């Protein structure tokens, strides 16, 4: 007997306030990355000028490539932080997915209705009254 395909998806829907808090945190990180980026660009320009006036040097070439690599890394991190901000109006992915085989399997095996009764006080009172009416009819 094969096991059913089980897929558990847990996704949290963010409220507007939670999204704005996350966005503020991300913008603070991105602002610091911008400061680091500008400092590295300035250092890269200093190395360029020194490299131009003093001539070829292996150590300056290494520093130049290292600074260029840091510039690329910092810019990638900035884009990553900005793209990681949750959007409250976005529809969660699990609502777009089709039902898995496991859900079809469970539907075919279940004898219970798919919709459950509401737990409101009015409906509970109606159920209680009908049960009491049935017990009175059965006893008489």
UniProtKB/Swiss-Prot annotation:
GO CC terms of this entry: membrane
UniProt subcellular location: Membrane
Keyword Cell membrane in annotation: no
Biased composition (Polar residues): 105-121
Transmembrane segments: 33-53, 59-79
Membrane topology label: Multi-pass membrane protein
Main location: membrane
Name the UniProt record assigns to this protein: Putative uncharacterized membrane protein C622.04
